[in-house]
A protein has these predicted regions:
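Karyopherin-beta/Importin-beta family HEAT-repeat alpha-solenoid scaffold
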Residues: 1-301
Length: 301
């Protein structure tokens, strides 16, 4: 990834289509913060609020918007409303400008999202963590199983980070959202690549041994999976932990159990039946019905 001493990506500048390097345009960040204050202040006039809103929308189309979005979103000292807007700058670039980016530019944007994902904190508001995870999904729909082949490994690495389970919750959001948007047929971006994306989803969720037994003559094609177990097995192992006696009263683990069951429900319609059986998904969903937490029971039913 190309960059300058300020950490600002310079990819594609020579072609006039990149994130230009002007030292980060230091005057823009305080103007963004001022505009956000005007929008959210109850004391702002309607005219001031409308002008500030128009300015914030206009910034999204600027070539440097993704860089400023990454800079602000990375700064945990910023107010959540500022960081949420910063993520929206990245979201706009991914959704509406992705096809115009060169390979190095797209890689830079993806690396920024990966860095934000790794650096989420338990104290970050849930809506910020989910917004970041949605950015991951948006990039996956556009490039996973094409020029982005190590996504599964990156998810596993996040899953295995020690300490808080915040990264596990992040991965669960990515898995559920990706499953929903690839297989429900309503997302137009995913629909354009549904063949590659659906095959990749089956690949990473299913234990490798089940794939080999179910399709002994299958052509592996593009390698997208990391390790042999697959996500159905990992989800089951964590669900057992969440419902175990040592974790049953932990609010974080209760919430995690709900998210795991939500992923189960999303993947059951398309997962290979033998994989569902091998990973004991149905048995674990039945076990959740006996949980002491009503929210877990409801999702598991």
């Amino acid at each position: 990834m190309n960059g300058s001493t300020s950490g600002h990506s310079t990819v594609g500048v020579e072609a006039g289509t990149g994130y230009q390097n002007d030292g980060g345009n230091t005057t823009l960040l305080p103007r963004i913060q001022q505009a956000l204050e005007l929008v959210h202040s109850p004391y702002s006039s309607n005219e001031s609020r409308q002008e500030a809103s128009a300015y914030l929308e206009e910034i999204k189309t600027d070539d440097e918007a993704p860089y400023h979005g990454f800079t602000l979103a990375s700064d945990h000292s910023q107010q959540p409303v500022v960081r949420h807007y910063a993520l929206s700058l990245l979201e706009f670039a991914i959704r509406y400008k992705w096809v115009g980016y060169s390979g190095p530019q797209a890689t830079t944007l993806r690396e920024w999202v990966l860095q934000l994902s790794k650096n989420i904190l338990p104290e970050d508001p849930l809506y910020l963590r989910n917004k970041t995870a949605q950015l991951w999904v948006e990039i996956a729909k556009r490039s996973w199983a094409d020029d982005w082949l190590d996504m599964d490994e990156l998810l596993v690495r996040l899953w295995e980070l020690q300490g808080s389970i915040v990264h596990k919750e992040f991965v669960l959001f990515v898995l559920e959202t990706l499953s929903d948007e690839v297989f429900n047929g309503e997302d137009t971006v995913a629909a354009l690549r549904v063949g590659a994306l659906s095959k990749a989803c089956v690949e990473i969720f299913t234990p490798a041994i089940v794939l080999s037994e179910a399709f002994p003559n299958r052509h592996v094609g593009t390698a997208v999976r990391f390790r042999e177990d697959g996500w159905l097995v990992r989800l089951g192992e964590l669900l057992d932990q969440c419902l175990g006696p040592d974790s049953a009263q932990n609010l974080q683990y209760k919430a995690c159990a709900v998210k795991i069951l939500a992923v189960y429900k999303s993947v059951m319609p398309w997962a290979i039946p033998r994989a569902i059986s091998s990973a004991s998904c149905v048995q674990r969903m039945c076990t959740s019905l006996a949980a002491s937490t009503v929210s877990v029971q409801l999702v598991g039913s």
